[in-house]
């Protein structure tokens, strides 16, 4: 029978140096590290936009602010932080709204002779060179595949409720790595990259590796909670709860911002233009929306 541990507070917080030492302390392995580590990071930004015009303006603002080009820069920073090498970038802005980016990565630099010819190695993003047809070089023949290997993806979902004046912006980020790379040390950067009212994180480890004596290991680093890898200052502004299944190497943390400062949730509107009673009603509506997201 699986044991599930649920906590309302942070479990065993370590300082940043201790966190880094966990990631840097390596087992002596036999052959390739076959562990797959996957971090799913979901954030919700919530806004009060009363009129239909305000709702559409909010969606347009979010859609432009977090377009595929900016998201690509965020993922490239994540790739750099985990010490990986870009093999291929695929990005797209959608109509009427939303964007996605997919970055195929390798654990270390690969000889170009061994990189599949369909991979663009990030050239459409890094290079502005145009071919004879006016397209960015290599962009028109990009193929993105091998999603069972190490990759980083992001998808955005802006939307608004037609009745209760609440608009939301959801971002889904997945960092999946094979080998020695762990995505956990990117958490603080990802939290800072978005206006995060609600954060849901899932981390799991699959497969096994062996040490030099042949003993199996189902994890190559210590972890009791995802919160161990988040800075204390960030944890103070959120209520956090864990649901962890240690035997299966499954870790889940949900964080909800503690204080709602109404001005931060209004779109193109000043809080002092709203009557006190209505302010309270809006605040309660925002809180209910957060709790049911």
For the regions a language model picked out, list residue spans one by one.
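Polybasic/polar functional segments that serve as interface/processing modules
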Residues: 2-290
């Amino acid at each position: 029978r699986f044991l599930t541990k649920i906590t309302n507070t942070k479990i065993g917080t370590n300082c940043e140096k201790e966190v880094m030492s966990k990631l840097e302390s390596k087992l002596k392995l036999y052959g390739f590290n076959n562990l797959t580590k996957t971090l799913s990071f979901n954030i919700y930004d919530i806004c009060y936009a009363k009129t239909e015009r305000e709702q559409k303006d909010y969606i347009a603002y979010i859609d432009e602010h977090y377009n595929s080009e900016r998201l690509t820069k965020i993922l490239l920073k994540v790739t750099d932080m985990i010490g990986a090498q870009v093999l291929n970038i695929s990005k797209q802005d959608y109509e009427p709204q939303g964007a996605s980016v997919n970055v195929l990565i390798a654990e270390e630099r690969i000889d170009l002779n061994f990189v599949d010819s369909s991979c663009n190695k990030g050239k459409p993003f890094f290079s502005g060179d145009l071919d004879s047809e006016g397209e960015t070089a290599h962009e028109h023949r990009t193929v993105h595949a091998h999603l069972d290997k190490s990759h980083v993806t992001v998808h955005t979902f802006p939307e608004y409720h037609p009745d209760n004046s609440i608009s939301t912006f959801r971002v889904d980020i997945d960092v999946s790595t094979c080998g020695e790379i762990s995505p956990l040390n990117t958490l603080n950067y990802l939290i800072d990259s978005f206006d995060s009212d609600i954060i849901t994180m899932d981390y799991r480890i699959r497969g096994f590796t062996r040490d030099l004596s042949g003993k199996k290991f189902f994890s190559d680093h210590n972890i009791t909670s995802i919160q161990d890898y988040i800075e204390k200052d960030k944890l103070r502004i959120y209520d956090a709860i864990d649901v962890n299944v240690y035997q299966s190497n499954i870790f889940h943390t949900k964080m909800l911002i503690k204080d709602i400062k109404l001005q931060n949730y209004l779109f193109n509107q000043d809080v002092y233009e709203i009557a006190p009673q209505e302010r309270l009603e809006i605040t309660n509506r925002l809180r209910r929306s957060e709790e049911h997201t």
